[in-house]
Structure formats: structure tokens, C-alpha cells
Amino acid sequence: MTMTGQQLYPIGDLMFEDLVDVYKEQAEVVADAGADLFVVETMMSLQECRAAVIAIREVCDLPIMVSLTYNPDGRTLYGTDPATATVVLQSLGADAIGINCSTGPEDMIEPVEKMAEYATIPILAKPNAGLPELENGVTVYKTGSEEFASCGKKLVEAGASIIGGCCGTTPEHIRALKEAVKDMPVHKPLTQKRRILTSERKLVEITLDGNFMVIGERINPTGKKKLQAELREGSLNMVRQMALDQEENGAAILDVNMGMNGIDEKEMMINTIYEVTSTVDCPLCIDSSHVDIIEAALRIYPGRALINSISMEKEKMDKLLPIAEKYGAMFILLPLSDAGLPK
């Protein structure tokens, strides 16, 4: 499975749910045909990766490997770095994360090292046989099998435990690679999970070292008559400016709440997610008293979000915890149970 070639909204016209349906149709056919696992590869968009993983997980529980391609600046076409992609996709349920096609093997070492800092799942690397060159109208790859295999050893040392070859590689490349790495120790993923939120382009780690972390809570219509009026008109100009102002003033995370009368709260929440994620790089905190609105927001959010909040009341936990798990979200837990406030 790979990219569709279409641009997702709001950059293009393809809606997220339509893309999930495309991948789901493919996943159903492949799973029914007897596939052992899914490989989602040569991906340039983290959001398209999310759509593919969600689609597969809604069809079956077969293993999923997801591999992105990165530009020379270390980011995808849409600005995602390897660490952010790793955090998002492993929290969403991918079984392996990696890089393929982008470059030759030498240039994959640094991205693999960055993934290894965060990966709790195996890392895969499938480089090209060097960068493509055009000779007499024919595309050629000039990295020979021995050089390819030598760099493959460095990829294993960097943290890759699943390796192979992409464009320009031949059976000789793979044979040499196997011989070079067959006796090397297999890299083990991290066992300690870290508290990390992300947007599509940035990650924020929540540490317990006493450092103060600012969550901006201005995007909330409660007590803001001008914002309420704008939202009823369908305008998000104030929301956009609030997001920019809070990021500029040092907010690490932005809380988004659309709870008010006179609007379709779910539709406005979704529109706000699109607007804010297109405007700033801060991860978002989804704030609503309605379970369906929280789920709708998490489904289209192109990162790993925070839920504000989940109380310890059984009914609410039974509804929200499976949603948080499905979309890989973190949550604020309120110590309020069916027995009331703790003493």
C-alpha cells in the first residue's frame, strides 16, 4: 500500500474519511486473499500513513509495517521528521516503523538513529542503491553490492532490525547485505514508553522533572462574546489569531474547545482542527464533554493529541479509554469517580 497521488484536505480536495475508505477497500481484499502482513511504504504524508493504519486496523489485526520517505533536509514532503512519525504511528498501532526509497544507505543512518531514540517497535530500512542518475536517457543506480552491504551494517548499528533494498537494488545487493549483517546483534526497541504529544511537524515531551509546561486555553468560546459571534458566522479568523498568539507567547500545547450554543459543535471542532494545524506547529489538546466530538477530532488530527479530560467514572472510562487507545491519544485523568471526589 502506498500514496494515492491525491492531496488531502485542506491542501487538496481528498477528504480524510474518503481516503480511509480507499485503504479499507484495499485492505479487505488483501486480507481476504491471505496476506500475512501489510507494508505501507514510500509514504510522504504522515496523515496518509494514519489513514492507512486506521483502515487496516478496522479490517483486521494483521501486522503493519509503515515506511516513509524523507527529503535531504530530514523531513517528508509535508514537513514531518522521523521522530514525530515514529511516535505517532507506533501509538496508532503500527508494528514496525521505518524509511525506504528516499536515498542511498549512507544517508539513511541519521534518520534511523533519530527513530531509535523513540521507537518501542522494530525499525526498518530499505535504501536505494544510491541516488538515481540519468545516463543516455536511462536511470541508473551506481552503489555496488559491497558498498551497499557495508552501509547496511551501519544501519543495523544505528538501530534498524529489518533491512532490505529499494530502487536499483538487485539480488546481488541483498545477498551481500545478508552476508554482512547475519551475525550482528538485533537492535531491541525501547521498553520504556515516553509521554510525548505531537502535531504533524513537531513533538513535545511531557517530563516529570519539574519543568513547567504551558497549555494555551484561549481557543474556547466560553465568556468570549466576539468569538461566539464569529463562530456562529462560520468564521475562524479569531481562532487562527489566538493560535498564533499563544504559540508566539510560549505555549507548548493548545487546548481546543468549541462548546457553545447555536453551532454544530462537531463540525466546528473538525474545522478548527484543520485551521489550527495548518497555522501552528503546537500539538493539540481536544476538549469536549461529548465523546463523539472527541473521537471525530482524534480521527482527523494529524498527530498524537491530548484528551482533556477523562474522569474515573465507569461509564465515561468505558467509552473514552477505547477511543484513546485506538487513536494513540494521551489523556488527562481526573480523580473523580462514581463515589465522588476523593478524600
Briefly describe each language-model feature range.
Residues 1-343:
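Domain-level signal for soluble alpha/beta catalytic cores
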